[in-house]
Every structure is written in C-alpha cells, then in structure tokens.
Amino acid sequence: AHFRYDAMFPASALDLGADVVIQSVHKTLPSLTQTALLHIKCNRPDEGCYADRERIDRYIHMVQSSSPSYVLMASIENSIYQMEQTDMAPYGKQLHKLRRRLGQMRHLRLADTGLIGQAGIRDLDISKIVVSTRGTCLYPAEDGLTGFTGAQLDDILRREYHLEMEMCGADYVTAITTVMDSGEGLERLGDALTRIDSQLTDAGYKPDGRSGNQKSVYSMRCDTAMS
C-alpha cells in the first residue's frame, strides 16, 4: 500500500500490470487494523484485462456485511489523506541510516538489495527489515552447541528489548517499519540487533569447552558454520 508514495520503494502491482490487487492499508499506512482496499484495474475483460467488475461485485455482495464500519472506512480515507500530505524524506533518511548500520553486523545478516537477481528475486522493499540468523550458533553450557533460530531472536527482542517483530521463521525475523515510526524507534531497533550481534561475536568461546570471559548465553562459536 505504501509503494506509490516514494521512489525508494518497488513499483506497485498495479503499475506492473496486475488486474486485481488487495492492499492491507493497516500494515504500512496509518489506518486501523482490519482495513484494506480492493483495486480493480478495469471494468470488463474487453477493456484490456482479465478482471470482470460485475462478477467481482456479485461475489463481494454475497459475503459483505450489510452494516459496514464507518469508523474503519473513515480511517482508510484519513490514512490516504495523511500519506498525501507527508514528506517521506525524513523517514527515508532514517531508514537508510538504520539499514547501513545493520548491514555492518558480523553474524546476523540483513536482507539487502544484493539479493536482487538471485532465486527469482526481482526487487526488495527496504521498509521491511529482514534479519537472518543462518550460520549463527548458541553455546548454552547445559545444552551444548545449538543453532540460533529466528524464534529465539524474536523472543530476545520481545523479552529483553520490548520490540515486537511482525513475524519470525526458522532462521529469520521480519520487522515492518513505516513513515509513522520515529527516529528514536528505529534507533532502538538498531541498538537491539547490533547488541545481540556483538554478544554472538564477543563470547570468547574456546573449542575445549572452557569459555574465556563469556558474556552471554547467546554466545557464538565463531569457527562453526551452520548450514
């Protein structure tokens, strides 16, 4: 939903030729939860697309409520108005600063534009902060060497830094940033991730099991790579 508001974002699906697009405006625009927009490129197939507006309207009428929330609809309109009035430059500057900082992490890895062209990746939304834990290891003394998972990173960020991620997977976490995020909030995210990364790096783990100046249970054995 935010792509059209600045050139730093990828082209929107509509700009790339999609006939029907659903945008969850509550994700990245200042709109209430549950709000979304349905975009239809044209009214009939003979107008140059595969969408049939009459059929779509018929199916919507089968499932939609007869008592829509005017609060939610007003929220959508207000969010669009706000975005039209917002200068994206300060947010873009803060976002690029955060990404440069996270790009310097030694073991946690930020998904960046270097991935474009690989494995079918055509573009990248820089407002999504995707951090990979692949290749990092924990060394809790009671459990031995274990892989550091996305779920563990997500838990640490929530429990120790009071930062809620959008989602996590087996070996990554995803944070969503928006124009409504403050510079202070983005800096807090950068502080948390770089600190966790430094704990993985500076643990002083030794292969014989004797840890020298171990600083954290999230310690990484730097001579081990997880595939």
Annotate each predicted stretch with a short phrase.
Residues 1-115:
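Conserved PLP-enzyme active-site core in the AAT-like
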Residues 99-227:
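Non-catalytic terminal extensions of PLP-dependent enzymes
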